[in-house]
Amino acid sequence: MAEGKKIGNTLLPSESMKVISESVGISQMSEETCQLLAQEVSFRIKEVTQDALKFMHVGKRQKLTPSDIDAALKLKNVEPIYGFHPKEFLPFRYASGGGRELHFYEEKETDLSDIISTPLPRVPLDVSLKAHWLSIEGVQPAIPENPPPVPKEQQKTEATEPLKVAKPGQEEGLPGKGQGSGEGKGKEKKTAILEGAPLKLKPRSIHELSVEQQLYYKEITEACVGSCEAKRAEALQSIATDPGLYQMLPRFSTFISEGVRVNVVQNNLALLIYLMRMVKALMDNPTLYLEKYLHELIPAVMTCIVSRQLCLRPDVDNHWALRDFAARLIAQICKNFSTTTNNIQSRITKTFTKTWVDDRTPWTTRYGSIAGLAELGPDVVKTLIVPRLTVEGERLRSVLDGPVISNIDKIGADHVQSLLLKHSAPVLVKLRSPPDSPDAYRADYGYLGPTLCTHVLKARAQSALQGPQVNRTTLTVTQPRPTLTLSQPSGSLTPSPRTPSIIKVPSSLTLPVQTLMSARPATPTQPSPPPTKYIVVSSAGSSGTQVLTTSSGPSPSTPGVQPIVKLVSGGQSSGVGGSMTGTGGGMQKYIVVSLPPAGESKTPQPSPPPPTTETSTL
């Protein structure tokens, strides 16, 4: 949402392009064409305006005139716009008399009778003293006595358009506003400077922090670079969420910049990581607008990416993680603050590319440059990294397959190769169509071709596996330990004398509980498995025990299955749906069949007698 507002403030709306095109007879223009045309027109207008401002400054004027615009258009070999040159300067009126020429502001005449007849204002209230809380547990209460926090939109306006936030009398007091007196003062100043008089400069105004803010700044900075991880986490959380850090933002920016400058010289990897985490916390704070401080933050982050050495032992310490983290930070900065006016992303991309293509660049700096380019998006990888895979592969071959010159160079080459394969494979999956052969990749990309082909094949396989899973219903089956309890309904069974059994016979039949949880209410595409059968064999032997055999098929995949209990006797038996007759002397089988709903007509087949290997004695 914030990015949309930012782009809307710097570009002409696409609706204007449609209206202009319709006025010249072009009625059908796509939205994409209008947006591209709006970007181009905005860029040209800004370019002409900047050139006109240069002519204004050369002419030592404080206001932009149509002649400056005409001069800028002539500089671009464009015909100037005619008919907008006034005969007199509009804010001033001209008068002459007594041999003098005067230019003055036209003021409205005020009648004294109107002033006399105006009723007097109300008498102000008497002076009184009132106490209020400045802060409660570190949080400023929202009361009329306390100043409201500076909103992020105002910070952005102050950073991009400082003239809009100037006080009403401040702009008028600037030198050179009046024509009559400005020329004389300008000549006097030039004469005084030429004679060697000291040049008077406007003193800088330094904003002073309160005692509480100074204490907070001291505690936060010490905790962020200290040895206690718990305090560091709390400090970073405070920086990322506190809405009252606007006044301390210049101090934090300077602290990070100076800290990186000192610790890079001392090769202190830990403190550099802590400082980059501070940058991440500042960027995560939604109430801070960092554009006015990018001139200090961007060099600090870029130093952690492309510096030659960040630690004392480059072959052991993991400085590669710091370079990756800083590369992600610089990509986020480009995403949030790059516009067609400042061109932050294009300038950073040019810096990374210039460092990477240099043959004298060490492997650590080369790794950082590639990581920074890769984090800027797949378009940058496609345009800048993929065309140089052949050249970079030959450089890697000379280090990895050649004589070992330095262990540090070999480790750096390994990391560069892994980084190139990691970021190039997803892009090549979209650029190249299958089949992928190592010979074709070797011909196109040289030394990295076969390994790159392997990574592309893995990426295609992963995308093929992940593709069907998007529309596939996920079934999670939770099946606790099965418990079978036998019951004898009254009136359905003929009582018979039974021997004592160790199986307890309650008054209900409990089947295994199966819970099906689906990611969305849809019918699974897999075919339904066959019905589940539970066979319970009960026999009365001389030992006074019963044999219980359970044979289970695949668990049902659809809810709503109604079980049917069928009892079969060893001698003669007849029973359907729970009714049966039998004698106590023969062998009995309890068959529990789980069938699908009534809509599907399937006749379950009786299960064969269970094998002896599945018989367990309870």
UniProtKB/Swiss-Prot annotation:
Please provide the Gene Ontology terms (biological process) for this protein: RNA polymerase II preinitiation complex assembly
Instruction: State a GO cellular component annotated for this protein.
Output: transcription factor TFIID complex
Compositionally biased intervals (Gly residues): 572-587
The record's section on CDD domains has:
HFD_TAF6, TAF6C
Organism in which the protein naturally occurs: Xenopus laevis
Which residues lie in Low complexity bias regions? 549-560
Where composition is biased (Polar residues), the residues are: 476-496
Mind listing the GO molecular function terms for this protein? Answer: protein heterodimerization activity; RNA polymerase II general transcription initiation factor activity; transcription coactivator activity
Summarizing the function annotation, the protein's role is:
The TFIID basal transcription factor complex plays a major role in the initiation of RNA polymerase II (Pol II)-dependent transcription. TFIID recognizes and binds promoters with or without a TATA box via its subunit tbp, a TATA-box-binding protein, and promotes assembly of the pre-initiation complex (PIC). The TFIID complex consists of tbp and TBP-associated factors (TAFs).
What keywords are annotated for this sequence in UniProt?
Nucleus, Transcription, Transcription regulation
The UniProt subunit note reads as follows: Component of the TFIID basal transcription factor complex, composed of TATA-box-binding protein tbp, and a number of TBP-associated factors (TAFs). Component of the TBP-free TAFII-histone acetylase complex (TFTC-HAT).
Protein name in UniProt: Transcription initiation factor TFIID subunit 6
| Family the UniProt entry places it in | Belongs to the TAF6 family.
